[in-house]
Amino acid sequence: MTPILYLLGGIVGALVAAFVYITIASNAEANHQDRVLSVAPIGPEFDAFLRALHGAAGNCVVEGNEVEVLQNGDEIFPAMLGAVRASQSTIHFSTYVYWAGAIPREFAKALSDAAQRGVMVRLVLDSEGTGLMPRMLANQMRDAGCKVTWFRRMQWFDWMKYNHRTHRRLLIVDGKIGFTGGFGIADEWTGHAQSPSHWRDTNVLLRGPIVAALQSAFTDNWNQSTEELLLDMRDFPRLTPTGDVPVCAVVSTPANGASAAQRVMAALIAGSTRTLYISNAYFVPTLSFIDALCAASDRGVDVHILVPGPYHDQKLVQRASRHSWPRLVEHGIGIYEYQPTMMHAKTVVADGEILLVGSINFDPRSFALNAEFGVAIVSRRLAADTVRSFEADIERSIQVLPATIASRGIANRAMDAICYWARAQL
């Protein structure tokens, strides 16, 4: 064979391999479609809906918690670092993003200092998401006494597992204070969304019995990475009520059947009767979710969706997202592109009653492939606060109109369709 034939054969082989890989992942997604036949509406039958939420999440709604919503790096990082510096017994930290920069160095120092004063510090770092992390930071923490492990490094003999990441963001201090949300340990999350280099995100601080669920999610990833079981009393201290907010943990792990993240999202959409406010950085709904959102709008629910605009770190995901917009807009759903910077939040507010916050993206990867964590917070006050933040974000956004979609042209729409076909691997 001539060199050109070898080259052509290699190209064809690569294309076939890519097709098989995407098809396998797409089939996984197809097995995770949610079609909610019926669910108690949130408003008129709230207690019944909470029981349904329990069934969807696979966790009870836990009473007696204190919850604080933290917007952007200016609020989340001082709170997290303050908790680390005040720690006394344990720090458990799991993150998908840990890059280079000033804030990663500050966290490495704070965690190292904690370990040196006798605190047990454990970190689970996703091996894909932390690819930009300088190894000197990991070495610094290990030398100080921190236990650091990487989740699912690439292994040629088990390469399909590499497709399943831990996307969870969890910080648990002394087993009593927990943080979760969309944050990453990178300078992009610093500030207050004031410029393109400072991203927009939403996170929560939790105290009370619900923190045990965060600890459990961390120990799950730790066990997968190290085969160690964390059962010490220091890891699971006695937790007493500290507030009056009910919270349900959404601990989502890839499985055969719909994941907890997908089930809860489907329940919130199906149960809504008045309003739905969705902020999501990677909004690529499956066909069944497009049906569910359109059905919600058709029955009178006021649906608004906030997505990134000109600043997006995953342009192919943005194209896939845009493929879903025509039908949603046709059914009266408001879609808004955030203009100032990358919008990285992952929140849902349903009927002004329930707020969902966490790492869960509205895409097949979060629903079928990644380990995720979120909390469904039952609080009108916190829901109202988040809606006010959403409305402030809309003022800095541009609404997607039918004319906007039509102006994209055939070539752009064709590329959007191709990206949507490959959505399971974006």
Residue ranges, per PLM feature:
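Charged, low-complexity intrinsically disordered terminal segments
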Residues: 2-426
